[in-house]
Regions:
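Conserved AMP-binding/adenylation subdomain of ANL enzymes
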Residues: 91-108, 116-157, 167, 171-172
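Conserved pre-ATP/AMP-binding loop-to-beta segment of ANL
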Residues: 51-72, 79, 102-108, 242
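AMP-binding/adenylate-forming catalytic domain of the ANL superfamily
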Residues: 30, 381-403, 421-429
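AMP-binding/adenylate-forming catalytic core of the ANL superfamily
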Residues: 4-10, 158, 244, 250, ...
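Adenylate-forming AMP-binding core of the ANL superfamily, especially NRPS adenylation
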Residues: 191-195, 230-278, 286-289
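Gly/Ser/Thr-rich phosphate-binding loop
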Residues: 152-160, 169-232, 243, 252-253
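Conserved S/T- and glycine-rich ATP-binding loop of Class I adenylate-forming
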Residues: 4, 67, 73-76, 109, ...
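Structural core segment of the AMP-binding/adenylate-forming
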Residues: 1-48, 363-365, 378
């Protein structure tokens, strides 16, 4: 890369490794770097200096197949990897999401998501460019500041993560919210539960909530055209530009209704990532038998609708039963005192996984670990009742707000962890 775009919050870390970065000519910084910028051997410029536009035609049009950006994976199950993304893939993702949630030149899209994430770039910036609309990019997300920002920007479309949508739906009313009723017609992002979608419609007047799409940085695989009904819990149908299958551990295809690893391959050139930057071995691992192996567990129903089950590394096996951490987390988040949760494995002396729930309580909540466990006994299968529960002030997250489960797995049982075996709880089959 010759030009690097960096958020001011991460610039100091980049300065620390500047001596190892070869070929960089310019660093474009979004925001103000505290304590100034040191001499690092390349030009440092503010993105604000490049505001406006130049209507002069380009002397040379870019090759759609050429490398356009390095977008890093979320790093929730391990170290992040740089995905080599072409310009054509970037536009393909934007067009696919516009089919699911269209907007036009008179719309204003508001997003607080970081621009180093595929969501903000493709769903936000590129989609807006394709329709000729306007985008308002917030430096950060704030529940209390959301509606004032929507009012000030005139936003009619919002692109956020599902967890943020839940926080907003559960927040108290305010004057700006009342004034903006019906202003937002589309909320992009996932996952949104049916209850949260209903709250956005009734409280805020939004009409289209959630993206009904499934994909990774490497490839956007499913979506649903606007207006088509989707079964609850589904992420839509296979995108027509991809061949998507469900495989077992030996790469044999599985029939509808059976869960297995999601694999895909493109039916058109340059709509999927070109591999991981300088990680040929990792690229080879995920491209076994000429299929891209997503590392996700999913299934199709008889009608061709796709359902995400879990990350393969997060899929748990306990007492001979498979447990989806995704489904468990969705159930636990129904408790009014739980704000954030991660369900993950810890090592067991019995050879299988022991289940641990690491959670953050809502401010002021007095919920105990034992009380949460007793609440879960009545709501999850007996084999999914966790052995361990631990409350924390904060959970480790990446810049997109996703919990870094691999860190929690590595930490395992800590001195602050509650053990069901120390209680009087008896789980009945």
């Amino acid at each position: 890369a010759e030009i690097v775009v960096c958020d001011a919050a991460y610039a100091p870390r980049l300065f620390e490794v500047a001596g190892h970065l070869q070929g960089i000519r310019r660093l474009l910084v979004r925001g103000v770097v505290e304590n100034g910028c040191p001499d690092v051997g390349f030009a440092i410029e503010s993105l604000d200096d490049h505001r406006g536009h130049d209507t002069t035609p380009l002397a040379e049009l870019p090759d759609p197949a050429a490398l356009n950006a390095l977008i890093y994976t979320s790093g929730t199950t391990g170290p992040s990897k740089g995905c080599m993304i072409s310009g054509n893939q970037m536009c393909h993702v934007a067009r696919l999401l516009l089919r699911a949630a269209p907007f036009g030149p008179n719309d204003v899209l508001w997003t607080p998501l970081p621009l180093f994430h595929m969501n903000a770039i493709a769903t936000g910036v590129v989609s807006t460019l394709l329709v000729g609309g306007t985008i308002s990019i917030a430096p950060r997300f704030s529940v209390s500041g959301f509606w004032p920002a929507v009012e000030a920007s005139g936003a009619t479309v919002v692109s956020i993560l599902g967890a943020l949508g839940t926080l907003l739906a559960q927040a108290p009313d305010n004057d700006a919210m009342r004034r903006c009723f019906g202003q937002i017609h589309t909320v992009k992002g996932n996952p949104f539960t049916e209850d949260i979608k209903a709250m956005w419609r009734t409280r805020f007047g939004a009409r289209h909530i959630g993206s009904n799409a499934y994909g990774l940085t490497e490839a956007l695989i499913t979506s649903v055209p606007a207006g088509e009904p989707v079964p609850p819990g589904s992420s839509g149908r296979c995108a027509p530009e991809f061949d998507v299958r469900i495989f077992d551990d030996q790469d044999n295809p599985l029939p509808p209704g059976q869960a297995g690893e999601v694999v895909c391959r493109p039916l058109h050139p340059d709509i999927m990532f070109k591999g991981y930057w300088r990680r040929a071995e990792d690229t080879q691992k995920v491209m076994g038998n000429m299929w891209f192996h997503t590392g996700d567990i999913g299934k199709f129903d008889e009608a061709g609708f796709f359902y995400f089950v879990d990350r393969k590394k997060d899929y748990l096996r306990r007492r001979g039963e498979n447990i989806s951490s995704f489904e468990m987390e969705s159930a636990i988040l129904q408790h009014p005192d739980i704000e954030q949760v991660a369900v993950h494995a810890v090592r067991s002396n019995l050879g299988e996984d022991d289940l641990k729930v690491t959670a953050k309580r809502v401010a002021g909540a007095q919920l105990t670990e034992e009380a949460l466990c007793r609440w879960m006994v009545d709501r999850v299968p007996y084999y999914a009742v966790p052995r361990y529960i631990e409350f924390r002030v904060e959970l480790p997250v990446n810049p997109q707000g996703r919990v870094l489960k691999y860190q929690l797995r590595d930490e395992g049982v800590t001195p602050a962890t509650w053990d069901i075996e120390s209680s009087t709880i008896k789980v009945q089959r």
